[in-house]
A protein has these predicted regions:
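Non-catalytic C-terminal accessory modules of carbohydrate-active enzymes
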Residues: 56-59, 78, 89-181
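Extended glycan-interaction surfaces of carbohydrate-active proteins
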Residues: 1-85, 117-118, 173
Length: 181
């Protein structure tokens, strides 16, 4: 068994685009819970990453792209499998939030953001495959994950389904304008 962090990426894309659930919800939730449990590491000191270890290393934490919780890891790992990518961390975190697992999602975000504290890494440049690489823009899904704010331009409907209790204010951006909700 392999725990791939992006195993239900298409389901996340369908959710943030308003398509709705495509896969069985229980299986999606089970997958994301397993990824949170097995792939999120608070300390990578004992983790060997022979590829590009500067994304996360030493006592830093991160969400590993792939794990083998029941054994069976390849002797020669496939490319990138041992890495931490902010774009995948944000994707998994926002998907967890969209499914009501807000604390688990926030735990991933905090672990990720702790690496970009301005001492070792630029907090405004979550580099993965070059500076200002676009995958980290999946962080935009965190707004929807927490606030449930999504605008459907086809039907001209603003959806607001907050996952946090109490009043809040959120950023909103559409093709024709932006503001706060």
């Amino acid at each position: 068994m392999r725990g791939e962090a992006d195993g239900v990426l298409g389901e996340w894309m369908a959710a943030v685009c308003g398509v709705g659930e495509v896969l069985d919800r229980e299986k999606t939730e089970s997958h994301l819970r397993a990824v949170h449990r097995h792939n999120l590491k608070k300390d990578l000191t004992a983790h060997a990453n022979p590829q590009r270890p500067t994304f996360a290393y030493g006592a830093e934490g991160g969400l590993l792209l792939c794990t083998w919780p029941r054994g069976g890891a390849l002797a020669l790992p496939f490319v990138y499998s041992n890495e931490v990518w902010t774009g995948i961390e944000y994707q998994v975190a926002s998907h967890l939030m969209l499914l009501g697992m807000v604390e688990e999602g926030l735990e991933i975000v905090r672990t990720c953001r702790d690496r970009y504290d301005g001492r070792t890494r630029n907090p405004f440049d979550e580099y993965e495959c070059g500076h200002w690489y676009a995958r980290a823009m999946s962080s935009y899904g965190l707004i929807q994950g927490l606030t449930g704010v999504r605008y459907d331009a086809v039907d001209r409907i603003l959806h607001v389904e907050p996952r946090l209790p109490g009043d809040f204010r959120s950023f909103l951006s559409t093709a024709t304008g932006y503001g706060t909700v």
